[in-house]
Amino acid sequence: MSHEIKDLNNYHYTSSYNHYNINNQNMINLPYVSGPSAYNANMISSSQVGFDLPSKNLSPQGAFELGFELSPSSSDFFNPSLDQENGLYNAYNYNSSQKSHEVVGDGCATIKSEVRVSASPSSSEADHHPGEDSGKIRKKREVRDGGEDDQRSQKVVKTKKKEEKKKEPRVSFMTKTEVDHLEDGYRWRKYGQKAVKNSPYPRSYYRCTTQKCNVKKRVERSYQDPTVVITTYESQHNHPIPTNRRTAMFSGTTASDYNPSSSPIFSDLIINTPRSFSNDDLFRVPYASVNVNPSYHQQQHGFHQQESEFELLKEMFPSVFFKQEP
């Protein structure tokens, strides 16, 4: 068996090869091959496939290669196109033409084919990528937005410059004193000091400690007359003068209109003042300037509450203040 020479061209195929013969009107009739002489029985027509097939007979191996050679590539098969006449999107619309050349030798055939895919009507549009348009539009927007931001920043800078140009009114006072910082009723905080040209005396800067008050002042001693202090105020106070509680209560009061029973400060004095103290300590207390009128207490003698307060006053203050005038 091993020394026998088989002639492939004259080899007769068995009837088992008949499974390629499919009797269907809608499908392609493949040839029934029983040997080389019977190969030209049924050929694939070009109208059924859509390609120009060679008219010459091929061997089974050539037909097998022909079947794979005619298959379009994936990029050609799935090239979409637009049917303008019907208005439908056809993903399989292509026109192909095949130029085949047959080289026959020992029952083998080689086919070289060219497949031409017709350009779709929207090929120019396909070459035009939408990403490029979006990139250009984005650049235009960035340029436009950047220009608007620049204009806004310029406007803000202009408004700031205008606000800086508006200077607050200044008032200067010249006072002959040995004290550099004079008391004016307001509370100040020193935030800087600067040397003055052609003057041995520095200039001090103060700011009002009240919230939301922008008043500033600067104090400097005149180099021409060292006894003169120049105080310059900038802006105006938007709040009243912060005064002390005791000075506010006793400013403008006299002994005739002072009522010890109705004053809350006087009751606080009775509660919080210690019982034992010297006469020197009494004169240091601001309440020592109060002069109690004895006739007033005689008029209020009928009220027990006022009598008790009067007794406490006798215990706290010396008897000198309660002597009746002749």
UniProtKB/Swiss-Prot annotation:
Cited InterPro entries: TF_WRKY_IIc, WRKY_dom, WRKY_dom_sf, WRKY_plant
Gene3D superfamilies in the record: WRKY domain
Gene: WRKY8
Function according to Swiss-Prot or TrEMBL: Transcription factor. Interacts specifically with the W box (5'-TTGAC[CT]-3'), a frequently occurring stress-responsive cis-acting element. Functions as a positive regulator of salt stress response. Binds the W box of LTI78/RD29A stress-response gene and directly regulates its transcription under salt stress. Functions antagonistically with VQ9 to regulate sodium and potassium homeostasis under salt stress by regulating the expression of downstream SOS (SALT OVERLY SENSITIVE) stress-responsive genes. The DNA-binding activity of WRKY8 is decreased by VQ9.
Protein name: WRKY transcription factor 8
Residue ranges: DNA binding: 177-242
Induction: By wounding, abscisic acid (ABA), salicylic acid (SA), H(2)O(2), and infection with P.syringae pv. tomato DC3000 and B.cinerea. Induced by salt stress.
Pfam assignment, any one: WRKY
Record's subcellular location: Nucleus
One GO BP annotation of this record: defense response to virus
Assembly mode: Interacts with VQ9 (via N-terminus).
Biased composition (Basic and acidic residues): 125-153, 161-170
Family per similarity comment: Belongs to the WRKY group II-c family.
Disruption phenotype: No visible phenotype under normal growth conditions. Mutant plants show increased resistance to the bacterial pathogen P.syringae and enhanced susceptibility to the fungal pathogen to B.cinerea. Mutant plants display increased sensitivity to salt stress.
